[in-house]
Amino acid sequence: MAAKEVRFSDDARVKMLAGVNILANAVKVTLGPKGRNVVLDKSFGAPTITKDGVSVAKEIELEDKFENMGAQMVKEVASKANDEAGDGTTTATVLAQSIVTEGLKAVAAGMNPMDLKRGIDKAVIAAVEQLKTLSVPCADSKAIAQVGTISANSDTEVGDLIAEAMDKVGKEGVITVEEGQSLQNELEVVEGMQFDRGYLSPYFMNNQENGTVELDSPFILLVDKKVSNIRELLPTLEAVAKASKPLLIIAEDVEGEALATLVVNNMRGIVKVAAVKAPGFGDRRKAMLQDLATLTGGTVISEEIGLELEKVTLEDLGTAKRVVINKDNTTVVDGAGEEEAIQGRVAQIRAQIEESSSDYDKEKLQERLAKLAGGVAVIKVGAATEVEMKEKKDRVEDALHATRAAVEEGVVAGGGVALVRAASKIVDLQGDNEDQTHGIKLLLRAMESPMRQIAANAGAEASVVTNAVKNGADNYGYNAGNDTYGDMLEMGILDPTKVTRSALQFAASIASLMITTEAMIAEAPKEDAPAMPDMGGMGGMGGMGGMM
C-alpha cells in the first residue's frame, strides 16, 4: 500500500480553501448576462468555448492532492445542482465559495465548527421556506420563454423556441435537442406516437417519392410473438379485406412465409398491408405494446393471456386515423383509444416514474409517458462552426432543463434578487448559542454573493448594486443586461424556484462538510528515482605487453 500524507486542522483547511478558490474563480466569471467565456483545451480537435458553469468545473483537476480535494468537493456542488434542476451550477459554486471562505475564517477565529454548521442548516431551512412564498407559478408561454431566454444567456430565440415546443407537445411531452444541419435553429414536432422501427420490407412502400408507407384509417394488429406461419394470419387478413381497410401488423417479428405472403398480397392489391417490429426489448416491449393497445383501442394478442392469433376478430384490432412508416420510424397519429383508458395508463406510468430509482428507467418511462400524453418535439440547433454548435447545444439543453424546473415549482425574481429578499425576511433568526447565530449570519451574507458576482461581471460596483436592491422592495432588482433597476418579473428576468432552491441547499450542504473537516489524507507524492550513475570513461586498457 502506498504511503499517505496527512494534514490536520488549519494546515488542511488552508490547502482545501486554495482548491475551492481556484475552481470557483474559474467558474464564477461565467455568471450573469455579461458573464465571460471560458476556453477549454481538448486533447483532439478545436478548443471548446463555454459559459456553462458545470462544463468548466468538470475540466478542473489540480496537481496538489489536498487542493484538488477542495476543488472536487465544489465540483460536486455544481454537478448536484445540474442533476437536480439542470441549471444553477454557477450560482451554487459562488454560494459554496462564499460559505466556505467565511466559515473557515470563523473556525480559525476559534468558533465551534459543529455549531456553525447547525446555524447554517437552520438558516437554509428558513430561506427555502421564504423562497417558496416568493415563488410565482409559471403557466403561460411568455413566462416559459423568459425563463428559457435567461438560462440560455439572454438568447431570446432559444427561449421562444422552447416555449413553442412546450406549447405543441404539452408540459409532459418529450423535447429533445439535436445538432441541426443548417445555420438556423429549427423545431420539428412529431404528433402522435412515434417509435424507432421501420417497415420490414421495402415492398410495402406506397409513396415512392418520400420512401414511406402511408395507411389511412388502418386496422392495427398487435402481436407479442414472432409470426412466421401465414395460416395464423389468414382469418385476420380475410376479415380486413372484407372491411376494405388497410392493416398494420406490429409484432416481435414477421418472417419467412408470412412476410412473403403479406408482400405478395400487398403488391397485387388484394389487401393493403404493412408489417413492423414491435419497439423495445423484453419487458419494455410488452409495456410498449400495451401502450399502443391503449392508444389505438386494440388488444395485444399474447399467448400468455390465452389469446391466439387464429381466433382474432376485428374487435381485437386497434385503429388510428393515419399511420406513416419510413425505413427507421413508425408514427401512429390520432389513435382511437378511449380518453379515459389513456389517462389511466398515463397515471400508471407516472406512478412508476415516482417509484423508479434508475435514471435510465425514468428517462424511458418519461418517453413513454410523452408519447401517450402529447408528442415529441425536436429542437435542431443550427450554427456556423462545430465549436459554436457545441456551445449552443449546451446552452439550449440548460435552458430546457430550467424551463421544466420552472413549470414544476414556479419562478422567482432573477439576478440574485430572490436570495437577497429571502435573506432579508429571516434577518432576525437566532441560533441556540453565539456560534450558531454566527453560522446563520454567515449564510445570509453568502446569499448576497450571486448578485455581487453578476454586478461585478457586468462592470458595476457590487456593493452599490447590492445596497440599492436591499433598499428596494419585492421584485425590485438590478438588470445587468442593460444596467438598469426595476421590477425583475416585469423585465422578464426570472429564475426557476427549483434552480435557486437547489443551488442554495447543495452549496450549504457541501460547504458545511468542508467547514467541519479536521484532517485530510492523500497519497504522498512519489520521490523521483535518481537517474543511473554516470559510468564515466572505461579507461584505457593499459599496455597489454608481453602478448606475443
Swiss-Prot record:
Q: What's a single GO CC term here?
A: cytoplasm
**Keywords, A to Z?**
ATP-binding, Chaperone, Cytoplasm, Isomerase, Nucleotide-binding
User: InterPro entries per the record?
Assistant: Chaperonin_Cpn60_CS, Cpn60/GroEL, Cpn60/GroEL/TCP-1, GroEL-like_apical_dom_sf, GROEL-like_equatorial_sf, TCP-1-like_intermed_sf
Q: Which reaction does it catalyse?
A: ATP + H2O + a folded polypeptide = ADP + phosphate + an unfolded polypeptide
Q: Name one GO molecular function term.
A: isomerase activity
An individual GO BP term: protein refolding
Q: What class of enzyme is it?
A: isomerase
Q: Which residues bind ATP?
A: T30, L31, G32, P33, K51, D87, G88, T89, T90, T91, G415, D495
Cellular compartment(s): Cytoplasm
Q: Which domain of life is it from?
A: Bacteria
Q: What is its EC number?
A: 5.6.1.7
Assembly and interactions?
Forms a cylinder of 14 subunits composed of two heptameric rings stacked back-to-back. Interacts with the co-chaperonin GroES.
Describe the task this protein carries out.
Answer: Together with its co-chaperonin GroES, plays an essential role in assisting protein folding. The GroEL-GroES system forms a nano-cage that allows encapsulation of the non-native substrate proteins and provides a physical environment optimized to promote and accelerate protein folding.
Family to which this protein belongs: Belongs to the chaperonin (HSP60) family.
Q: Know the name of this protein?
A: Chaperonin GroEL
Gene name for this UniProt entry? groEL
